[in-house]
């Protein structure tokens, strides 16, 4: 399965909800989902009663699309979550939240996760002072994430910071925009992820069948 490079708004319509894949645009009047909040295609307006399996599948697909993760990697995250002690749901959420591209987005250095992935892939991001260009890199509590000094004048980064200055960031993070750096303080708790419109328990049930 290749990474989806098509129109992001179609993914929101397919899932029947806003996935906020385009960042600030999703909150504006220009958001296409507000005009056509139904699935694309000839039968997109038809409402179907979904089976339990279908609901579980949709939950999994939705979470994968929000974080931009492919099936093989997502299953690995689930298998790790099961092996860890504690709540499997919370462990699974922590696996995707610890992705470097997600942390860069959460810190406000990019307007969305796709843009954050590009920043990481192009070598603009440092972890504990060393360049890491792997978007799926797992950040650990205490890690310092920063923008490389030579990349701090890049317009998309400056725009993202200007947009996010003054906004509250996630409780498990700390950020200093003047220094272009932030800290991944701890793993988040499930109830703290307020922008994840997914029944994570349904995903656990899907994989545990």
Swiss-Prot record:
CDD domains assigned: S4
Entries under Gene3D superfamilies matching the protein: Ribosomal Protein S4 Delta 41, Chain A, domain 1, RNA-binding S4 domain
Domain of life of the organism encoding this protein: Bacteria
UniProt keyword annotation of Ribosomal protein present: yes
Keywords, alphabetical: Ribonucleoprotein, Ribosomal protein, RNA-binding, rRNA-binding
A molecular function (GO) term: structural constituent of ribosome
Domain S4 RNA-binding: 98-166
InterPro entries attached to this UniProt entry: Ribosomal_uS4, Ribosomal_uS4_bac-type, Ribosomal_uS4_N, S4_RNA-bd, S4_RNA-bd_sf
Gene Ontology CC terms: small ribosomal subunit
Gene Ontology annotations of biological process type: ribosomal small subunit biogenesis; translation
Free-text function comment from the UniProt entry: One of the primary rRNA binding proteins, it binds directly to 16S rRNA where it nucleates assembly of the body of the 30S subunit.
Binding partners and assembly: Part of the 30S ribosomal subunit. Contacts protein S5. The interaction surface between S4 and S5 is involved in control of translational fidelity.
Similarity field: Belongs to the universal ribosomal protein uS4 family.
Protein name: Small ribosomal subunit protein uS4
Organism: Fervidobacterium nodosum (strain ATCC 35602 / DSM 5306 / Rt17-B1)
Species classification: Bacteria, Thermotogati, Thermotogota, Thermotogae, Thermotogales
Gene name for this UniProt entry: rpsD
């Amino acid at each position: 399965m290749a990474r989806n490079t098509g129109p992001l708004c179609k993914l929101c319509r397919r899932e029947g909800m806003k996935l906020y894949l385009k960042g600030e645009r999703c909150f504006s009047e220009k958001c296409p989902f507000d005009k056509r909040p139904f699935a694309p295609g000839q039968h997109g307006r038809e409402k179907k009663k979904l089976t339990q399996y279908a609901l579980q599948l949709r939950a999994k697909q939705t979470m994968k699309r929000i974080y931009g993760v492919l099936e093989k990697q997502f299953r690995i995250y689930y298998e790790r979550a099961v092996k860890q002690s504690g709540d499997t749901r919370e462990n699974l959420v922590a696996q995707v939240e610890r992705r470097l591209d997600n942390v860069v987005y959460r810190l406000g250095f990019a307007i969305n996760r796709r843009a954050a992935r590009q920043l990481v892939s192009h070598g603009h991001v440092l972890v504990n002072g060393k360049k890491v260009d792997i978007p799926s890199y797992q950040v650990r509590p205490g890690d310092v994430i920063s923008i490389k000094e030579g990349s701090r004048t890049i317009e998309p980064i400056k725009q993202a910071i200007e947009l996010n200055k003054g906004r509250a960031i996630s409780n498990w993070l700390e950020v200093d925009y003047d220094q272009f750096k932030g800290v991944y303080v701890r793993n988040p708790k499930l109830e703290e992820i307020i922008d994840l419109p997914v029944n994570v328990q349904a995903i656990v049930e899907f994989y545990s069948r």
